[in-house]
């Protein structure tokens, strides 16, 4: 197709831009090979010439190079098409190895139409990079990971706000995702954890409150749990607390702390500067959960803001998360959790009896 060549090197003495003087710089990657840069010299007839590799970046995690990765597609009970990226440990075979503990790591988003909510945001050909705070770290510990499952909150029509049915849509999306990974034989339904960062942490806490049958535990990092403390809007919510008080309260895990019976790990940076996620959010939520008898742990990372940067903080976060997942998603963890819950309930009853006497 005809096109134009634009150069920032001009002037009366400038040589014309021709194909044979052009060199193209591009990058290439695959699901198992990290991105490398190449140079391609063009020829006068427009055909590509010699390709030269000009970088040789080492693989960032060679032990997890051949990760089984699949973009799975499924439907919510109202017909909305959803998708997510399912990872399993290297060498895993569902028929041979059976179901695994699974970590679902997500971040819900608002949409105005079902079509927009159903769009695919990932590519099966993208390189799988694993950062220090990525959920994919747990593949090395034998967990399956459902990364970024679509949890759309949709508000179609004039005057319809997505968040007015936030809880119902969130639970429907999570249930569809869990049903899919269980039906595939990849996930043990009694050993599924849910987690997220920021608005994903808010999501994880809500799912423990409103869909306790789906998850064994949750990890919530740097979240906001009381929406009355963000009264002038949050995410895509433009209404104020005074314009939509019912929605703000219904969406707040803090207001539903008494419903949370499954274990939840709260992690927060001590100096979180994000406008909606001050440390107070996790501190108050922790107190509410403890007061209602939930199994909860709060980890505060000193000198950290909304994201964690220090090596010590990241290692601490990974260690706490590892211990939490192993305690609640390992074989036999459900019986142990039930025993702990019964012990805590008995201690609470004993304390109440002593007060009444």
Report the location of each language-model feature.
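Glycine-rich His-Gly loop
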Residues: 29, 105-109, 198-201, 269
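Exposed loop/turn and edge beta-strand positions of beta-sandwich/beta-sheet ligand-binding modules
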Residues: 68-70, 80, 100, 188, ...
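Short beta-strand element of the alpha/beta-hydrolase
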Residues: 88, 96-110
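Short beta-strands and strand-coil junctions in structured, solvent-facing domains, enriched
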Residues: 92-94, 112, 273-274
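Active-site-proximal cap/loop segments of hydrolase catalytic domains
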Residues: 119-357
């Amino acid at each position: 197709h005809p096109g134009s060549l634009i150069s920032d090197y001009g002037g009366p003495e400038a040589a014309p831009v021709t194909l044979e003087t052009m060199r193209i710089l591009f990058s290439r990657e695959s699901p198992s090979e990290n991105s490398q840069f190449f140079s391609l010299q063009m020829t006068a007839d427009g055909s590509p010439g010699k390709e030269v590799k000009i970088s040789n970046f080492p693989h960032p995690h060679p032990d997890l190079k051949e990760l089984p990765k699949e973009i799975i597609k499924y439907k919510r009970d109202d017909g909305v098409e959803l998708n997510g990226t399912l990872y399993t440990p290297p060498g895993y075979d569902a028929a041979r190895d059976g179901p695994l503990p699974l970590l679902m790591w997500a971040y819900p988003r608002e949409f105005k139409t079902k079509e927009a909510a159903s769009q695919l945001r990932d590519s099966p050909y993208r390189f799988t990079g694993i950062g220090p705070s990525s959920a994919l770290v747990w593949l090395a510990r034998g967990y399956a990971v459902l990364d970024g499952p679509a949890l759309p909150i949709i508000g179609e029509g004039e005057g319809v706000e997505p968040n007015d049915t936030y809880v119902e849509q969130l639970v429907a999306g999570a249930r569809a995702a869990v049903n899919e990974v269980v039906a595939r034989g990849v996930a043990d339904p009694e050993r599924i954890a849910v987690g997220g960062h920021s608005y994903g942490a808010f999501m994880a806490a809500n799912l423990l409150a409103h869909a306790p049958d789906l998850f064994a535990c949750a990890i919530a990092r740097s979240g906001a749990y009381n929406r009355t403390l963000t009264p002038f809007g949050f995410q895509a919510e433009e209404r104020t607390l005074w314009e939509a008080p019912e929605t703000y309260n219904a969406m707040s895990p803090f207001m539903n702390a008494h419903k949370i019976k499954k274990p939840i790990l709260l992690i927060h940076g001590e100096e979180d500067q994000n406008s909606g996620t001050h440390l107070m959010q996790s501190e108050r939520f922790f107190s509410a959960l403890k007061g209602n008898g939930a199994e909860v742990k709060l980890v505060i990372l000193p000198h950290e803001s909304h994201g964690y940067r220090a090596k010590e903080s990241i290692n601490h976060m990974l260690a706490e998360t590892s211990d939490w997942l192993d305690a609640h998603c390992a074989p036999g963890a459900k019986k142990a959790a039930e025993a702990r819950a019964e012990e805590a309930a008995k201690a609470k009853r004993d304390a109440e009896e002593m007060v009444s006497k």
